[in-house]
């Protein structure tokens, strides 16, 4: 298995393309100049395209991915109704979902043969909308509205329209600020990192009564931390054993172990990392974590080691200016 790592650097308007080898070393293979400040990125389910959101002219760009080395070639673009904060797709590659923090909306862009062709729906009134996350069964779109301390729940219709579910939302504690989410591989639990109080919530997708319930909340910061809390990103290993979340003020990654059924997180330790880590990701093998420092303009690669999933630094690399997003593709 070959793996490619893509790093989005909006301040220099670049995507750096790296080969990740089996020992965790990166080799730079391409630098793409992007027509705008590139921020969120996601790979299509069939691994043929990389979708990126750019500003100040709000668009989603599609880059064709070369199957041999992961190199990018521009393929298409489509206008968006707000500044793109987060970008994702459904599991069948029919739609792109874009959350916009500044516009307070989530939009759905239709894909034809992998290329974006236009917005088919927009839901407004989501103050601080920070991500859009499709459930493993491809039925429910979870959309955190950070400023409203709620996660809105939508069914995605066959034509891409978002229909509010019943109940239409779940709520966090006041002042939490739900931001980014991941799902456990067993499809029974979701995990949400809360930006404003730097905590992680565990959501049981369906309890015995068919309800969605928050079953655990964990503080992700060290006990003696007294500065401003400013959590950013969250990711889980492919086997579901280890979960990671980062805080930008403290410039650290918190390491969690996950119970076998996915219902309980245990805090295992902290890894100091690049300055102001806005984004990171875990590779397909579950062996390596790549973190980007928005203020250090570097990325670091860590090996995931032991039963606790602690991080051991393998290498550090200069990238573009203000790196914010890390995406890994396998081919």
Swiss-Prot record:
Catalysed reactions, semicolon-separated: 6-phospho-D-glucono-1,5-lactone + H2O = 6-phospho-D-gluconate + H(+)
Pathway assigned in UniProt: Carbohydrate degradation; pentose phosphate pathway; D-ribulose 5-phosphate from D-glucose 6-phosphate (oxidative stage): step 2/3
EC identifiers of the protein: 3.1.1.31
N6-acetyllysine: modified positions: 287
Pfam families listed in its UniProt record: Lactonase
Entry GO CC: cytosol
GO molecular function per UniProt: 6-phosphogluconolactonase activity
Keywords: Acetylation, Carbohydrate metabolism, Glucose metabolism, Hydrolase
Top-level EC class as recorded in UniProt: hydrolase
Gene Ontology terms: biological process: glucose metabolic process; pentose-phosphate shunt, oxidative branch
InterPro entries, alphabetized: 6-phosphogluconolactonase_YbhE, Cycloisomerase_2, Lactonase_7-beta_prop, N2O_reductase_N, WD40/YVTN_repeat-like_dom_sf
Family: Belongs to the cycloisomerase 2 family.
PANTHER family in the record: 6-PHOSPHOGLUCONOLACTONASE (PTHR30344:SF1), 6-PHOSPHOGLUCONOLACTONASE-RELATED (PTHR30344)
Protein function: Catalyzes the hydrolysis of 6-phosphogluconolactone to 6-phosphogluconate.
Protein name, entry field: 6-phosphogluconolactonase
Organism expressing this protein natively: Shigella flexneri
Gene this protein is translated from: pgl
């Amino acid at each position: 298995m070959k793996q490619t790592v893509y790093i989005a650097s909006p301040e220099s308007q670049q995507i750096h393309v790296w080969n990740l080898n089996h020992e965790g070393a990166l080799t730079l293979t391409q630098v793409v100049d992007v027509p705008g400040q590139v921020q969120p990125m996601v790979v299509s389910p069939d691994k043929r395209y990389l979708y990126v959101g750019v500003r100040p002219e709000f668009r989603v760009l599609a880059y064709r991915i070369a199957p041999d080395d992961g190199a990018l070639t521009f393929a298409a673009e489509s206008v968006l109704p707000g500044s793109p904060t987060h970008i994702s797709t459904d599991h069948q590659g029919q739609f792109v979902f874009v959350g916009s923090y500044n516009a307070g909306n989530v939009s759905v862009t239709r894909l034809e043969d992998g290329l974006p062709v236009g917005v088919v729906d927009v839901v407004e009134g989501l103050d601080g909308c920070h991500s859009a996350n499709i459930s493993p069964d491809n039925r429910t779109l979870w959309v955190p509205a950070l400023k409203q301390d709620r996660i809105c729940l939508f069914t995605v219709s066959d034509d891409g329209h978002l229909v509010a579910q019943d109940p239409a939302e779940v709520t966090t504690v006041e002042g939490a600020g739900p931001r980014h989410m991941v799902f456990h591989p067993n499809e029974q639990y979701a995990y949400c990192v809360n930006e404003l109080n730097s905590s992680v919530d565990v959501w049981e997708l369906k309890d015995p009564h068919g309800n969605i319930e928050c079953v655990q909340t964990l503080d992700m910061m060290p006990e003696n931390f007294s500065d401003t809390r400013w959590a950013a990103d969250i990711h889980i290993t492919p086997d579901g054993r280890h979960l990671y979340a980062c805080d930008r003020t403290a410039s650290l990654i918190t390491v969690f172990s996950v119970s076998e059924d996915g219902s309980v997180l245990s805090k295992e330790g902290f890894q100091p990392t690049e300055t102001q880590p806005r984004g990171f990701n875990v590779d397909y093998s579950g062996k390596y974590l790549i973190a980007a420092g928005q203020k250090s303009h570097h990325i670091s690669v860590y090996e995931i080691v032991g039963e606790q999933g602690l991080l051991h630094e393998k290498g550090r690399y200069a990238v573009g200016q203000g790196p914010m997003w890390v995406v890994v593709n396998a081919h």
